[in-house]
């Protein structure tokens, strides 16, 4: 039962990341169209954060979920209820890191298009790295 809810949780994350990646790509296209064809690599590549850090690893997780060896190991790991909550918290932290990376990339792209800089844009990269790596760390410590 917990494994099926885990798979549905991952399916939900894939849908959210797909919608967010599409939003980032459409936002970048519209923003650059109205900025008189001035481009920024940060703006163009913002959609890659949810794709590379969210969708691809989640598809791999789903493929691993279906293997018999993983199901046996997961049955032992998820036999206690509190561990599954820790797993969900780690995935939510990773998701927040992905969103922070993408928003920071869009913000940096906006600054590049306007031809200005801001020291505070580095906060997005540090916060995104902290959240994403922290989520992975919680997941590794749990095992």
Residue ranges and their predicted role:
Residues 12-34, 41-68, 90-111, 123-142:
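Hydrophobic cores of alpha-helical transmembrane segments in multi-pass integral membrane proteins
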Residues 112-117:
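Membrane-interface helix termini and inter-helical loops of multi-pass transporters
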Residues 63-86:
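Flexible loop linkers connecting adjacent transmembrane helices
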Residues 5-12, 38, 78-92, 119:
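Juxtamembrane loop-transmembrane helix junctions in multi-pass integral membrane proteins
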Residues 2-5, 62-63:
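C-terminal ends of transmembrane helices
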Residues 71-75, 118-121, 125:
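Generic alpha-helical propensity signal that fires on short helical segments
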Residues 1-3, 73-76, 141-143:
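Short, charged juxtamembrane terminal tails flanking transmembrane helices
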């Amino acid at each position: 039962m917990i494994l099926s809810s885990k798979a549905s949780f991952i399916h939900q994350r894939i849908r959210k990341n797909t919608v967010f990646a599409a939003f980032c790509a459409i936002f970048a296209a519209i923003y650059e169209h109205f900025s008189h064809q001035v481009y920024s690599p940060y703006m163009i590549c913002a959609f890659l954060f949810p794709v590379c850090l969210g969708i691809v690893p989640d598809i791999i997780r789903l493929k691993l979920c279906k293997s018999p060896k993983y199901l046996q190991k997961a049955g032992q790991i998820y036999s206690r209820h509190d561990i599954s909550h820790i797993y969900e918290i780690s995935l939510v932290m990773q998701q927040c890191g992905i969103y922070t990376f993408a928003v920071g990339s869009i913000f940096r792209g906006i600054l590049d298009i306007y031809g200005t800089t801001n020291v505070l844009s580095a906060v997005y990269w540090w916060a995104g790295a902290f959240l994403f790596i922290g989520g992975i760390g919680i997941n590794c410590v749990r095992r």
